[in-house]
Amino acid sequence: MIAAARARLHHRMLAERVLALRPQRSGGARVVNVADTDNAGSRRVAALLAERIRRQTELPSLLEEIPGERQGASFEHLISDFLKDCLGHMPPSSGSWEVLPGPALDSFAQYRHLRELKRLSDEHEELRLYLGSAYVIRPDIVVARHPMEDEELGVDLIGRGDDLARATFLRKSNAAAHLALPVLHASVSCKWTLRSDRAQNARTEALNLIRDRKGRVPAITVVTAEPMPSRLASLADGTGDIDRVYHVALYELQGAVQDFVTEDPTKGYWEEDLARMVRGLRLADISDLPFDLVS
């Protein structure tokens, strides 16, 4: 099932021209639109990566991107559909899961206090100047976990004492305490590529999710199609503010980098960097993401 969902994702990336060829303003050869056009290595690995994906989809050729298309928004939509597809087939566990595109953080139990904080900052200019807008975060994609009736959880699990387990978000009967809001189980940030500003934005979002919550920290993940190992390392390396970076086609990228190093042995460190991140559990393929989200 995961293999089929991954294959559908790759097919849609090409068929819907999300992963596509981009004409250069200078009139030179078209480049794959995940490449850094100013970096020859990035252009070559992106081309090798796209060709490996194309061969697996059995589409005849890579198409030209749609003029004015926002790859980031299209990428988010594809990843959201992939997660809905996969999580709907994962082994059942306590609570019901829902994949949602970018609701405000104060829609979730751990962050409900941000609603009042926003109201106060709207009313008081000095507070607004002090706080700024760092707390106003809308993750690209979230996985929400909904509270359950006691009957769903099982009387034997809770026992018959009404004075027990009154603070947990998972019990719907605790609605008076937390408005029966869903729990933010995971945040999935979608970054089509990882230029330095995008990597830094992802880190800032992650730190705000950690700092601003009351209760458990959600899983904090990033999905990308970035072809350059050094750019992946800019986000994957670090102290663990992000759980893990997931590549939309890691196995194909590993093959593309191997081919590139065969062509240019001086770039052997590209392959070494990629292997180091995978070995260190900082980088994984998107097929791992559904399992990690429910574990």
Task: Please report, for each region that a protein language model flagged, where it lies by residue.
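Short, flexible loop/turn elements at secondary-structure junctions
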Residues: 145-147, 191-194, 224-227
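Active-site-adjacent loop/helix micro-motif of nuclease/hydrolase catalytic cores
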Residues: 151-155, 193-205, 216, 230-233
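Acidic-basic catalytic patches of nuclease active cores, encompassing PD-(D/E)XK
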Residues: 58-162
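C-terminal tail/extension regions appended to the core domain(s) of diverse proteins
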Residues: 1-74, 78-92, 97, 212-295
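A short, acidic, amphipathic alpha-helical segment used as a generic capping/interface helix at domain edges
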Residues: 207-210
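Short, conserved, surface-exposed binding loops centered on an aromatic residue
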Residues: 133-134, 176-181, 212-214
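Conserved catalytic cores of phosphodiester-cleaving nucleases, focusing on short active-site segments
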Residues: 141, 184-190, 202
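Active-site beta-strand-loop-beta-strand hairpin of nuclease catalytic cores
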Residues: 145-186
